[in-house]
Structure formats: C-alpha cells, structure tokens
Design a protein with these regions (language model features):
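Glycine-aromatic micro-motifs
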Residues: 1-130
C-alpha cells in the first residue's frame, strides 16, 4: 500500500525507526494543498499551492505503527486520496496554527533535503504559524 508523508515522516531516519520495512518511492507534489503547522504538520486544501510529499510503500505492520505515531484517530484522521490510491493523515482539529518545535521542524527540514523537495512552503508554513 502507498502512504504520503508531508511532515516528520519525510525524514528517512525517522521513518526507518518506526517502519523499517517502508520503501521510499521518492518526493512528489500534491496539487491544491498546502502545508500548515498546528504544533505538528498538517495540510489543508488551497488551489494556490502544491504540497511537498514523500511517497512510501508500506506494510500492514507499518500502517499500524503509523496509526500509533499519528495518534489515530484522536489527533489525526487517516484517509485515502487521489482516487483512493494513497493513505494520508490530517489533523482532526483544523482550527488555528501553532509553531512547531525547533527539533520537529529540523526533522522535517532534513526530510525535505533527503528527497530534494522545495523547502519554500516549509519556511512559509513556519512563518505563518509564528
């Protein structure tokens, strides 16, 4: 199954620790979505943006671990997008923004570097959450 990561799980080291059997398939951009921070990474629909993501091939065991990591279903909801081909998590509470911790931000920043994703939206999302 396929999973799209846009936050901490863009980082290869972080993903390997929780889902060692996950296989990275590369960095991509999801149209009509933008990155936001609500303390943790989230996304929202916006036709003026594209969301940098990393696609992973994951196992059933990995999906269970991701559910724990994302505090599903309390903090994050899990849905399938793009004709139900990809799993992606988004926050249940879509209200407001909040800056991420420096460590969390650096972890995502490294993930963007790992997959040569454009860091502009990452910086904008952090600035807007401040």
């Amino acid at each position: 199954m396929l999973y799209l990561a846009y936050g901490m799980n863009t980082n290869q080291e972080a993903m390997a620790s929780g889902c060692p059997k996950a296989k990275p398939l590369g960095g991509f951009y999801l149209p009509n979505h933008r990155l936001v921070f609500r303390g943790y990474a989230d996304f929202e629909q916006n036709s003026n943006y594209i969301l940098p993501v990393v696609m992973w091939e994951i196992t059933d065991d990995c999906l269970k671990e991701l559910n724990k990591l994302e505090d599903y279903p309390r903090l994050y909801n899990r849905t399938k997008i793009n004709e139900r081909r990809f799993w992606i998590y988004n926050m249940n509470d879509q209200s407001g923004t909040k800056s991420p911790s420096d460590d969390y931000y650096r972890m995502i920043e490294q993930g963007y570097k790992d997959f040569a994703l454009d860091e502009y939206q990452l910086r904008v999302a952090r600035h807007e959450a401040a």
